[in-house]
Amino acid sequence: GHFILTNRLLPLMQTKNNGRIVHVSSRSGYGQAPAVGIDFDNLRGEKSFDAGQAYGRSKLANALFSLELAQRLQGTGLSSNAIHPGLVQTNIARTAPVLMRSAFEWFGGVIAKSPAQGAATQLYVATSPQLEGVSGAYFEDCNPVVISGQNHMTDSAMAKKLWATAQSMCGQYLT
């Protein structure tokens, strides 16, 4: 996954002292994730599973990974940021129940971004000279967004715990 790939590429990136890592997160990271944030006692959904919360939790995990990586990259010339691409015209709902899929396709066709529009923020964060040295931020529509309220998107303690858990789970693949 993201954790292994990024950690395997970091040594190469660090030889250049310049580079940007952009993580695709989502508003779902704070809108759909359960109130507990990352449920470390139910990571694989073995106790209970809700598809919407699982999606939100995965996007929260991407944002937390980006946040912790930004801390670890301080002073290296590398940066880590997370983005929300917006609602993009994709086939993400292809396996949803028929009613939900139909609603998503209709609603998405009316207000969703094209794939090119959905990629704009990711490309901006990856390439804009204006963002040189910016790390640990979250972007929507090519703008930094400050996340506030009752959520875990900026929970550095949870980000550290998630990193440690991922290291423990993936350790054999990191060397």
State the predicted function of each range.
Residues 43-46, 99-107:
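A short C-terminal helix-loop "cap" of Rossmann-like NAD(P)-dependent dehydrogenase/epimerase domains
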Residues 58, 82, 105-147, 156-161:
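C-terminal helical subdomain
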Residues 53, 106, 150:
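Conserved short-loop catalytic and cofactor-binding motifs
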Residues 64, 120, 164:
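Short, contiguous clusters of charged residues that form electrostatic/catalytic patches at enzyme active sites
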Residues 19, 98, 128-131:
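Short, well-ordered loop/turn and helix-capping segments at boundaries between secondary-structure elements
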Residues 1-96, 169-175:
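Rossmann-fold NAD(P)H-dependent dehydrogenase/reductase core
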Residues 151-175:
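C-terminal amphipathic/interface module of NAD(P)-dependent oxidoreductases
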